Amino acid sequence: MQHTLTRTASLPERSSSAHSAATALPALRRPPDSCETLVPLLCIFWFVFVSMSPLPPARANKSDNKGLISADRNNKATLLLTIPRCTSKSYTNDLSPLKMTLLSAGKHPRPFRQEHRC
């Protein structure tokens, strides 16, 4: 079955020039430039009200502190963490690790490793 295209009387004939084709077709009605005026208004709103708004006031609380974490000075368990090591008090010496010394039972202690001479 062969289909043929026929022109109807309601459509105007197309011509070779673009100008005459545009004038021959009925003009489509668009909404009155609502999209073209809305975008610049949104840009102006963003610039004026959002980017130019003042920064929120600085809050002084412990959750905003991004620096070094310091121990609570009222807590005796963490008090040692706040004292510099060179100026520590005498009671911190009790908590420091003990130095171990090795004692030998004989006159000549055995070496830990065998000495290999070449």
Curated annotation (Swiss-Prot):
It comes from the Eukaryota. The chain crosses the membrane at residues 38-58. Residues 1-20 have a biased composition (Polar residues). One of its GO terms (cellular component) is membrane. It is found in: Membrane. Residues 1-26 are annotated as: Disordered. Keywords: Membrane, Transmembrane, Transmembrane helix. It is a single-pass membrane protein. Overexpression confers resistance to the antimicrobial peptide MiAMP1. This is Protein YLR162W. It comes from Saccharomyces cerevisiae (strain ATCC 204508 / S288c) (Baker's yeast). The lineage of its organism: Eukaryota, Fungi, Dikarya, Ascomycota, Saccharomycotina.
